[in-house]
């Protein structure tokens, strides 16, 4: 480790799960956002236990990652935040085929994301689980859930659509993999909705405070940078072990708000926690540049959203 341990073996005070609610508020305040965002918070949490063994269940994969769009600019590892690549409608894909999904459209930790899609889209691991008989079957489709700051839109539009598609596929349980801070809220709201309608769920994520503040039935927390909820990058063993935590939680959780923490540590230095979404680390010049960039990104995202909603209204 790159820090001196306490005499009693304590970790540094900052080596704890990042408080993303506080960080995002401070970050966007520094960027000039004038409205204080309220994250979803519930007192009660729905809970649907499995009614049959997991080895007999059909399991769906839900993601906030976006299909790669070659005409929308850089979207791979190292790409800047790309609002043009956002999506605002639920989409589905055939789980029998491979898919090129990216996460440049969301506010992940760009310094610690790689080209290893297994960290945010564990479709290969779920295929292996199905082949091994760990789950009864992988649902024929995975579903992409839009990341939307409007909780009302998520609850009134996207969640019912996801539920309808899961029911069409005969789904018994769903695994939801979150990426950015708002993705964690979206995944949590979707999990709650599915659970209230009889589908067992587990969220895999890295923003512990956002998920637990919203309140979900089951949560696998990996203390990794955002965008790595399903595995450590380029660590094949971590893909199946992290998924197994989610599968075991589906089987054995007996009450809502059950969180299991991934015992794996991030492979790199833990100091990433001090820098992520921390405006104090930016020079005045860099902060000014980020403010201008944020204004441009918001305009692009709004244009994409407006166009999507207009298309939906005409359909």
What is the predicted role of each segment?
Residues 2-234, 238-245, 249-250, 257-315:
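Metallocofactor- and cofactor-centric catalytic cores in central/energy metabolism, strongly enriched
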């Amino acid at each position: 480790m790159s820090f001196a341990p306490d005499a009693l073996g304590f970790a540094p005070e900052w080596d704890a799960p990042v408080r993303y609610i506080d960080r995002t508020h401070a970050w966007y305040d520094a960027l000039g956002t004038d409205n204080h965002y309220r994250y979803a918070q519930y007192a009660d949490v729905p809970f649907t236990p499995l009614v049959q063994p997991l080895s007999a269940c059909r399991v769906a994969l839900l993601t906030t990652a976006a299909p790669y769009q070659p005409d929308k600019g850089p979207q791979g590892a190292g790409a800047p935040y790309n609002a043009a690549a956002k999506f605002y409608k639920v989409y589905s894909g055939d789980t029998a085929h491979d898919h090129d999904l990216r996460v440049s459209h969301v506010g992940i930790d760009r310094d610690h994301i790689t080209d290893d899609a297994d960290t945010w889209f564990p479709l290969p691991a779920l295929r292996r689980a199905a082949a091994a008989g760990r789950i009864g079957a992988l649902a024929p489709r995975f579903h992409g859930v839009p990341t939307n700051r409007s909780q009302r839109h998520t609850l009134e539009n996207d969640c019912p659509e996801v539920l309808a598609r899961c029911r069409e596929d005969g789904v018994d349980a769903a695994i939801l993999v979150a990426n950015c801070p708002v993705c964690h809220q979206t995944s949590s709201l979707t999990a709650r909705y599915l659970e209230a309608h009889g589908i067992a769920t587990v969220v895999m994520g890295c923003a512990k405070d956002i998920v637990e503040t919203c309140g979900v039935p089951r949560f696998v927390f990996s203390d990794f940078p955002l965008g790595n909820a399903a595995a450590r990058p380029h660590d094949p063993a971590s893909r199946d072990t992290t998924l197994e935590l989610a599968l075991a939680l589906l089987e054995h959780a007996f009450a809502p708000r059950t969180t299991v923490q991934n015992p794996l540590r991030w492979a790199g230095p833990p100091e990433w926690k001090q820098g992520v979404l921390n405006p104090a680390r930016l020079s005045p010049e860099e902060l000014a540049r980020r403010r201008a960039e944020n204004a441009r990104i918001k305009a692009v995202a709004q244009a994409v959203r407006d166009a999507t909603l207009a298309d939906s209204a005409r359909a």
